[in-house]
Amino acid sequence: MRVLGRMAALVGAAAMLVAIPGNARAASPKFSETTTIGTHNAYEKGKYTYWAQALDSGASLLELDVYADSVSRRWRVSHDKPLANDNNCEYADEPSELYSKDRNQDLGSCLDNMAAWNQLHPDHAPIVVKVEMKAGFNNDAGLGPDEFDTLVSKKLGSSVYKPSDLLGGSYSSLDAAAKANAWPTRDALKGKFVFELIPGTVEESNPLDSYWTDEEYGDHLRDLYAAGRIGEAQAFPAVLGAANGDPRTSRYDASIRPWFVFFDGDAATYVNSGYDTSFYSTNHYILIMTDAYGVSPAISSTNPTDAEVAARLALLAKDHASIITSDWSAKSASVLGSVATRG
């Protein structure tokens, strides 16, 4: 281990771990009880040559930008090309094909890569796949929540941790399940992907679009549950944007508020503004803090030292984050795979 890596490990251990005597083994913490690190826009070729390398990175969250292309009726993966693919996902659906095939593929191929990689790493730590629907769903073109669920289910099957898994047959809403801390342990989530959905920047700036991804998928979850089909849903919609208090109250109809247990917003806004983020950990909600580098004192957004990453993780764990994200793709798997105790 390099000196800085050792320092980071020691800092993290001292700040966040409790010593276990003798040969006793600590029980695996629940998914809601830890703080981990994710990579913003991990599909970009400048960060990882191949999507499989992003999966190898140790990061606990990887982000995809997706466009619903009404012309081709395909899910495009790109930052700013709604009718084309520009990404590190390969045309590969077998483990032996990874790290070698043509890139710039659609969402289906990104999921194929994940399925193939999963065969090589069946006990990997849980990975949140954050999907930004850049311009929203397009239900009229056959690219709505139902079709998204169908694609994810077809490609990844039982390797997805779904809303119905959190409900477990015991709770009538995701909110009730989260408040009961019904989340599984991290060990129980080995080999699993968890999908988070957020509205996209194009959608948010479109004056003709007032039905954003979060609300549309929230309606979708409510309706599936009412129809006895909640098992079909593959993703958790997130409330986007840092706010004080419970942002669901002012944003959504009361009928869908209980279907939001993921929250996603700028770390500096949460922390530097003094928002009471204990609300999220008290209720066992999943809180993703983005642009973690920007919290005072700011550190590099791309390549901070290992010790700086460890300190930032410890700081934001105390501020009740579940996952902190930045563009730290240059960091090693031992750094990006760090797990801290939340709260």
Stretches found by the model and what they are:
Residues 27-343:
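Catalytic cores of phosphodiester-bond hydrolases, prominently lipid phosphodiesterases
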Residues 1-26:
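Secretory targeting and sorting signals
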